Amino acid sequence: MKTLNHLNKMKASQQKISMVTAYDYPSAKQAQQAEIDMILVGDSLGMTVLGYDSTVQVTLNDMIHHGKAVKRGASDTFIVVDMPIGTVGLSDEEDLKNALKLYQNTNANAVKVEGAHLTSFIQKATKMGIPVVSHLGLTPQSVGVMGYKLQGDTKTAAMQLIKDAKAMETAGAVVLVLEAIPSDLAREISQQLTIPVIGIGAGKDTDGQVLVYHDMLNYGVDRHAKFVKQFADFSSGIDGLRQYNEEVKAGTFPSENHTYKKRIMDEVEQHD
């Protein structure tokens, strides 16, 4: 079973960490079979699998539902579950209640929060025994304000991001995710921090990489970010669906090969 200690040893020995964002049992099972080190159950499931326009409509119960499914599919993988918008940054009592509910109900290894303003929450959650992963740079929950664009691309912004990253580690974050920032900045942060730093759109010099399952396998996704590489093409499944549709309508499916051979109506008629 992958643990935080395992991830820390990987960083110390300069072994790259692989992470995939997945949302259900079959994708998690495949990730574990592929020996992926970490799985993130991201609130991006709102757009990717629930068809919402953003993450705003994703609830804590949604995250618990999908987190449980992922855990069942990849029980030996280090699993992180997002705290969705509206569940953190409230009062200390509400924040910790939501974090504990998510952590306990999913049996995840950590919860993840976005933004540099949550140091107090990270400290309190850590003290309670809940491991927290921090996410800086482009933070999807704030994309309505900051837009989908490169972050940390000025001297001032880069210096602030380094400061924020250090603050996350000091507060107790166990892993840091950096999204859509210059690669040299990501390298500098990775070198300055002792905790694992996972990049997405942050170059190759972070301690690891994360991509969304559906993006990297071209599964039901219309647009791809610059930093996404497609490692397989699941959209070919559409051809299979078309063929199925045609064969059903033509009456050629199911054939004898897909039909049980047992005949029963002769017995029924004899009984009558």
UniProtKB/Swiss-Prot annotation:
Associated pathway: Cofactor biosynthesis; (R)-pantothenate biosynthesis; (R)-pantoate from 3-methyl-2-oxobutanoate: step 1/2
GO-annotated molecular function: 3-methyl-2-oxobutanoate hydroxymethyltransferase activity; magnesium ion binding
Binding residues annotated for Mg(2+), in chain numbering: D43, D82, E114
Active-site residues, Swiss-Prot/TrEMBL: E179 (proton acceptor)
Catalysed transformations (reactions): 3-methyl-2-oxobutanoate + (6R)-5,10-methylene-5,6,7,8-tetrahydrofolate + H2O = 2-dehydropantoate + (6S)-5,6,7,8-tetrahydrofolate
Keywords tagged on the record: Cytoplasm, Magnesium, Metal-binding, Pantothenate biosynthesis, Transferase
Cofactor: record remark: Binds 1 Mg(2+) ion per subunit.
A Pfam family it matches: Pantoate_transf
GO terms for biological process, alphabetical: pantothenate biosynthetic process
Enzyme Commission (EC) number: 2.1.2.11
A single Gene Ontology CC term: cytoplasm
Residue numbers binding 3-methyl-2-oxobutanoate: D43, S44, D82, K112
Superkingdom in the source lineage: Bacteria
Cofactor(s) needed for function: Mg(2+)
Protein's cellular compartments: Cytoplasm
Complex and partners: Homodecamer; pentamer of dimers.
Job of this protein: Catalyzes the reversible reaction in which hydroxymethyl group from 5,10-methylenetetrahydrofolate is transferred onto alpha-ketoisovalerate to form ketopantoate.
Family assignment from sequence similarity: Belongs to the PanB family.
NCBIfam families associated with the record: panB (TIGR00222), PRK00311.1 (NF001452)
Protein name in UniProt: 3-methyl-2-oxobutanoate hydroxymethyltransferase
Organism of origin: Staphylococcus epidermidis (strain ATCC 35984 / DSM 28319 / BCRC 17069 / CCUG 31568 / BM 3577 / RP62A)
